[in-house]
């Protein structure tokens, strides 16, 4: 009589492999929807980047289907998690990104409410330009008072955004910016 052992540790069913490959193709579909500049910022492997850009050139349905399968095949050699994280950040879905945006909004509200908040902000972020921030605060308050479009209010937000770095932004396969 044969003694069968349960060797589940290395076994993946054919159905599971197909589901995994479909998930990689779906991730590839998300990549082909991105702009060329965004794709280049991601620093994808050269063959995958070329395949995604080629997909955008094709118009025949059969060619698009084959190219998407090829993209799925190339995705097998790439760790998909950094790509998924980057796409989440682009969509603004990551909890860290949302918390960062809320932090920016809180600082803007503090600065709009009280002039003394500027010294607190500059203590936390000393690279800020106090004169520029003070001018934006004054102009934003005046716009709010005169019921004008919030141009300076938005500029103040952009200035704060430039000073407070976004936490956990995935770097994927990027080289150090000092080396470029």
From Swiss-Prot:
One of its GO terms (biological process) is assembly of large subunit precursor of preribosome. Its main location: cytoplasm. It is found in: Cytoplasm. SUPFAM superfamilies: PSPTO4464-like. It holds the Pfam family DarP. One of its GO terms (cellular component) is cytosol. InterPro entries: DarP, DarP_sf. GO terms for molecular function: ribosome binding; rRNA binding. Member of a network of 50S ribosomal subunit biogenesis factors which assembles along the 30S-50S interface, preventing incorrect 23S rRNA structures from forming. Promotes peptidyl transferase center (PTC) maturation. NCBIfam families: PRK05255.1-1. This is Dual-action ribosomal maturation protein DarP. It comes from Chromobacterium violaceum (strain ATCC 12472 / DSM 30191 / JCM 1249 / CCUG 213 / NBRC 12614 / NCIMB 9131 / NCTC 9757 / MK).
